[in-house]
């Protein structure tokens, strides 16, 4: 039985996100990408919305790149609880790499590499890496248009937590574009071996079918790995991250401080924290509620700033006129965001600009108080 929705055209998606402001269709010129800006409790409860984390369509609206669907940590959702899992079902356990997801995007000249957001600086670093490695291009071009090969880019230039000693682009999955089906691990190894493409390693489960014991073993691992992914043969996936990895993201032990809670939310690390709060449901519920309120406030703020930008840009498309004739006449508190958006030339950058601004201004209580107006004066 298929567990993923069939997707061929952007119109297969749009009705499911029409009334969901957390999802955005970004026009990138020769392609469009559908992504989520924030994640609410029910954002991914719909199988179609669960696909909206980097779907890419060409100018005609045809699906051309389908990366991973949204999946969760063990214990993060009711349907990923330990009681709901059965390791006697066919599955493979894979090392969870600590890098950036990379996938190809077909184009007129062949393909570009992209992250969840499309062609980005991180993706261009991966493009430089494969420029003198024709085996990657040959492999990708063989699969292009029907399949999406999914890689992880690990590099000290792009270090998250785990320190990899060399740059590498490692194949983690191959997905059928239209159906969303994930090709089996053994088949991936065989086809990747033909082109000498590195493939993510499997992890031995010495606890057999005892999922609780296995999860605890993974969480007790050291600091040189992020964790594992349990991938069932039907495509269902779950993450288990090591406790050390999560703690190094400053999650569990620091939620007493507002600045740390804000950092967890802004760095999209909440999903790492929640499974470790199972023993403290009141803390878990409180931080989920706060994150939802915070993300809604940021969404509303970005909507306001984007509207201001679009109004001014329509009248004054030249940078100097925009600054002198428009920005000087709006509330000065919006000026830093409007100037940065002008550099990008569109309102799609607003969320990233606001997020980076807040990250730089939450390391002390006084700084948090100075930017609190941005998120509707919420307090942890």
Q: What does each model-identified segment do?
A:
Residues 1-380:
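Core nucleotide-handling region used for phosphoryl-transfer chemistry
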């Amino acid at each position: 039985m298929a567990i993923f929705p069939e997707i061929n055209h952007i119109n297969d998606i749009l009705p499911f996100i029409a009334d969901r402001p957390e999802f955005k269709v970004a026009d990138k010129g020769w392609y469009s990408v559908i992504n989520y800006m924030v994640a609410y409790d029910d954002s991914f409860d719909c199988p179609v919305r669960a696909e909206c984390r980097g779907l890419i369509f060409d100018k005609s609206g045809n699906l051309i790149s389908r990366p991973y669907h949204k999946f969760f940590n063990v214990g993060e959702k009711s349907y990923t609880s330990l009681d709901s899992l059965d390791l006697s079902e066919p599955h493979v356990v894979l090392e969870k790499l600590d890098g950036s997801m990379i996938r190809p995007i077909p184009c007129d000249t062949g393909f570009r590499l992209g992250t969840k957001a499309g062609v980005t600086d991180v993706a261009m670093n991966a493009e430089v890496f494969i420029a003198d490695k024709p085996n990657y291009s040959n492999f990708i071009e063989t699969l292009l248009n029907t399949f999406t090969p999914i890689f992880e880019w690990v590099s000290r230039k792009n270090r998250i937590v785990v320190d990899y000693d060399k740059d590498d682009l490692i194949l983690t999955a191959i997905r059928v574009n239209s159906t969303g089906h994930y090709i089996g691990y053994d088949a991936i190894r065989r086809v990747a071996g033909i082109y000498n493409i590195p493939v993510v390693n499997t992890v031995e489960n010495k606890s057999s079918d005892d999922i609780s014991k296995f999860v605890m073993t993974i969480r007790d691992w050291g600091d040189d790995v992020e964790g594992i992914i349990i991938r069932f043969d039907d495509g269902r996936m779950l993450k288990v991250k090591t406790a050390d990895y999560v703690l190094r993201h400053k999650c569990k032990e620091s939620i007493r401080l507002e600045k740390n809670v804000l950092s967890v939310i802004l760095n999209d690390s909440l999903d790492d924290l929640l499974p470790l709060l199972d023993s403290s449901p009141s803390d878990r519920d409180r931080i989920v509620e706060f994150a939802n309120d915070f993300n809604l406030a940021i969404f509303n703020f970005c909507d306001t700033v984007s509207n201001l930008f679009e109004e001014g840009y329509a009248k004054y498309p030249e940078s100097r006129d925009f600054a002198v004739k428009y920005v000087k006449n709006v509330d000065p508190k919006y000026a830093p965001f409007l100037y940065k958006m002008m550099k990008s030339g569109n309102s799609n950058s607003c969320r990233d600009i606001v997020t980076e601004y807040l990250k730089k201004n939450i390391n002390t209580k006084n700084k948090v108080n100075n930017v609190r107006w941005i998120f509707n004066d919420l307090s942890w």
